[in-house]
Amino acid sequence: MSAARLSAVAQSTVYAFSARPLAGGEPVSLGSLRGKVLLIENVASLUGTTTRDYTEMNDLQKRLGPRGLVVLGFPCNQFGHQENGKNEEILNSLKYVRPGGGFEPNFTLFEKCEVNGEKAHPLFTFLRNALPAPSDDPTALMTDPKYIIWSPVCRNDISWNFEKFLVGPDGVPVRRYSRRFRTIDIEPDIEALLSKQPSNP
């Protein structure tokens, strides 16, 4: 493949991006996940849906991970300051507070990042441009302007915690879901993508 073609592919897929795991260490290149179906969510420890969404993310990773699903969580404090702890505090918050009861995520969590505005992680800028609005709620917007703490504000901004992006095994974003769309209800779309995977990803 020519260098120009490789560059074009990189710009149209998530494979050009990387992020540092919450546990530390070297950044993980999403290019290492070629052939996998990715479910990417911006998460928060103190949201009203934290327990529901985290447990459903764990459930999908446990059941569909062996078939090629990879769930990725990106903690973000831009929505109601609901991820206001330090990176090293997040896992304890999940374990002892919400969801609590010894909960441990079985999917990869990355370091805190911003998903909107000038300092947004490049992956989320790419995802928002590729899928400008949630498919289940195309008019989704931040409902209370006092919560907008980033600049510039764009029409394709993520509106709250736990928006979801589904990425196909070719690295191309397929569908965006609003915070109101339950994580577990994405399963049929994940199944459809898993059935299209190459036999040896």
Curated annotation (Swiss-Prot):
Modified residues (N6-succinyllysine): 86, 112, 146
Tissue occurrence: Expressed in liver and lung.
Enzymatic reactions: 2 glutathione + H2O2 = glutathione disulfide + 2 H2O; a hydroperoxy polyunsaturated fatty acid + 2 glutathione = a hydroxy polyunsaturated fatty acid + glutathione disulfide + H2O; tert-butyl hydroperoxide + 2 glutathione = tert-butanol + glutathione disulfide + H2O; cumene hydroperoxide + 2 glutathione = 2-phenylpropan-2-ol + glutathione disulfide + H2O
One Pfam family cited in the UniProt record for this chain: GSHPx
Keywords: Acetylation, Cytoplasm, Lipid metabolism, Mitochondrion, Oxidoreductase, Peroxidase, Phosphoprotein, Selenocysteine
Complexes and interactors: Homotetramer. Interacts with MIEN1.
Name this protein carries in UniProt: Glutathione peroxidase 1
Organism the protein comes from: Rattus norvegicus
